[in-house]
């Protein structure tokens, strides 16, 4: 993967870290707790332990915190590793994050959907009533579909977590049974939620559709002003001095013991695995868990331009399914900090990881259909990201049984979005639950 944006505008705040080559500090010699992985789940777990005054060592294989939530700086542009947005209504995020410090910048509630050679504005009628009224009879969707959308808003009102009573119902089946037309599913739900689920067949559990629809309905979507990595950075700033070790990859884990790639062995009474499902399976072969399904992947191409027509901070969707680009967003319209003064940053998001050597040209061809030759000719390609392990597959399909237990066996714990639900909220919640499980094992109440 590309280099991290250490010390950049994307990395506000200063966390207390040790390089892997640094020997244990005062925390490390006394520590009885080791957390492997400083993504959102590991940081949320560390937050619980730090609030309780517990000493721990947090190991991170890479050179910065965040896991899959990372931001690079390229020529002054902030490039999130894969197109991501933040949902301010997430209950666990509201619990642990300082939104004012993140300086959240809202995204337009709705989308411009490209169908029949032009964009059609689908606006949230509650947030943008005049625009919704103006486009009330737009042929992109039927009046019945618009009414059914209001019924779905009522159905999910008040949800705080994915409902567990939908069993293994897939999202597409649920939408069809709820009364949406094939046109509405194909033109809006497939590109919009397909871009979130990273699969256009909408096989993902309808429970996640319910939960995310409720979150969008309640709080819309946004970006931190200085990039998505502002989220893990904010959590890392509160870590105790000497508790975080970067560039410290782990090769093996068992109850009471963590082995680093360097050969160093850390002993602890409590070990928390806060890594991806694939890495957890590799580190814990002794559990006998079945191999995880292949991960879902995504590709993002970033472009820069200094000449762009005025517009709203809105998501542009591929409603006709001709692809390969599923969505386009001008990130600098959402937050000007994403680009140097006088320039714009454009994100194009693709579901999957195509291996074509001509991918940029294929993307440009599609963008010319969308925005015109004159506009796209001025775009400069900055970087392409292929995120092959963007989301775990299995957890997306089956949510009815509830979250996985944090404790694997006495002294050994797990957390991550693959243990809860695949979202920022799920990662934060799973990390907190792992921290609370450690506190229970210690016979002490969790701080909050």
Give the positions of each predicted feature.
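Short beta-strand to alpha-helix junction loop
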Residues: 84-91, 166-167, 178, 214-236, ...
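N-terminal Rossmann-like FAD-binding beta1-loop-alpha1 element of flavoenzymes
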Residues: 31-58
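Glycine-rich active-site loop/strand segments that organize a redox cofactor
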Residues: 69-88, 146, 150-162
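Helical element adjacent to the flavin cofactor pocket in flavoenzyme catalytic cores
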Residues: 209-257, 266-270
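Conserved flavin/dinucleotide-binding core of flavoenzymes
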Residues: 331, 335-448
